[in-house]
């Protein structure tokens, strides 16, 4: 069970023999159109902190324009989305895209068909912060830098106002890291190569396109081959 695991794979259709469960109905007052049916599975959460990570799917709907209620990272697995902005511009999201909407950002969710996504949500007060990533929808640029694969490198592309959530693209050369106690929760998607994650319960290899989750406080070892690239979505409790 993931509740007792130090790390685990995030399955696109939810855990084996559990799958995705139907969630409560959206408030009709928040919708312009649609009668969406949303299903999901929460893999890890801190309800008192407004934190959760998981996978969900949903049928089509269009929301009212308004401030986004949470900081949310999303990795789209299926479908497409249009995020309309007050200035008339639109951000187009499609399957394979990773993106972040910051809490309080004004936009309209316009989804014309079925979508499935992996997500991380962080809620809480919004402190004053001068961070450019709080003033836009950040679509993660997976090829922003052409790194030298002999050198490990991280490119931070989003930091929330509270400083508790960040999104980075990490590129690693060949690595063999001994067990280290983790100081944050981490949702990781392998973009290229593979990584071997180990803990007291054993080792698991994750390859290109797979997503896994590491819990804060776990003693985790890591091994990678040459040319491994990952998206790390990190949450550090306040």
Question: Where are each of the predicted segments found?
Answer:
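Short acidic-glycine-tyrosine-enriched beta hairpin
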Residues: 87-103, 200-217
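Conserved short histidine dyad/triad with adjacent acidic residue
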Residues: 35-43, 49-68, 95, 103, ...
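Short strand-coil-strand connectors
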Residues: 47-49, 86-87, 112, 161, ...
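Ordered, small/hydrophobic-rich secondary-structure cores
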Residues: 8, 13-98
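A short, N-terminal "cap"/entry segment at the start of jelly-roll beta-barrel domains
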Residues: 1-50, 123-168
